[in-house]
């Protein structure tokens, strides 16, 4: 797993995240035994505005050595709320990125973070978010009810969303996440993916679904699994 705070802002003497990934692919190309799958790695959470065309091209060319899965924190499907959050993109721009990723890497899985109950979030804003995540087709949503952080402008706002409303919205969005995860899993039925064996019982596929680990597979190994 390649992860870090603001991972997409990586810069080492002018070398960016795409350059780093190229170096890692080259450095690990032979780190596998005869008959074993090549070493692969997964990108941690990356901000939408940091996903470049060059990076997407590398992801498409890497043939699964960089997992075809990205976690892109959206936070809200309402452009109005995104402006209130001071996010540097709107819902339309995020959708364009998602469409570009799916066109460039057809089997890609997309997951995200959503904050519900940000100050001033209306029922309409929340419905926009629900509709948006359906359109994008995320395979998993990490749902967080907004909580105050003292000293921030949002914490001082008078239009705080009541706790019971935040809880209801979070529950509904988690149910929607489960529905979308099942739909994504079903769309992959009949395919084979390499899965990382996490424990004797559980493995994680390239598309970030948990599956039963094959009997006798060693923890830390990559094994092909048939998705059903």
Regions of interest found by a model, annotated:
Residues 67-69, 105-111, 138, 190-192, ...:
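Active-site lining segments that contact anionic ligands and/or coordinate catalytic metals
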Residues 18, 22, 95, 127-130, ...:
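Generic alpha-helical structural signal
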Residues 145, 156-228:
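Terminal RNA-binding accessory module
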Residues 2, 43, 72, 113, ...:
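Conserved, mostly hydrophobic/aromatic
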Residues 1-123:
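Conserved SAM/AdoMet-binding glycine-rich loop
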Residues 4-6, 73-78, 145-150, 199, ...:
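Short, small-residue-rich loop/turn micro-motifs
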Residues 24, 101, 133, 173-177:
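Hydrophobic alpha-helical packing residues
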């Amino acid at each position: 797993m390649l992860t870090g705070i603001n991972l997409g802002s990586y810069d080492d003497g002018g070398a960016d995240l795409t350059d780093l990934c190229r170096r890692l692919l080259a450095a690990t190309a032979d780190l596998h035994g005869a008959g074993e799958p090549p070493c692969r790695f997964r990108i941690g959470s990356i901000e939408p505005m940091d996903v470049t065309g060059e990076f997407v091209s590398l992801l498409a060319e890497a043939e699964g050595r960089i997992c075809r899965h990205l976690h892109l924190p959206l936070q809200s499907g309402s452009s109005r709320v995104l402006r209130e959050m001071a996010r540097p993109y709107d819902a339309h721009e995020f959708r364009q990125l998602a469409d570009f990723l799916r066109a460039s890497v057809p089997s890609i899985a997309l997951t995200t973070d959503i904050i519900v109950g940000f100050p001033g979030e209306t029922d309409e804003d929340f419905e926009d978010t629900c509709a948006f995540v359906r359109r994008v087709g995320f395979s998993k949503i990490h749902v967080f009810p907004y909580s105050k952080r003292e000293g921030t402008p949002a914490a001082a706002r008078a239009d705080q969303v009541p706790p019971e409303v935040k809880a209801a919205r979070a529950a509904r969005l988690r149910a929607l996440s489960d529905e979308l995860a099942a739909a994504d899993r079903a769309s992959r039925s009949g395919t084979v993916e390499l899965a990382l064996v996490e424990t004797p019982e559980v493995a994680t596929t390239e598309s970030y679904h948990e599956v039963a680990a094959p009997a006798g597979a060693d923890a830390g190994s990559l094994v092909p699994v048939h998705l059903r």
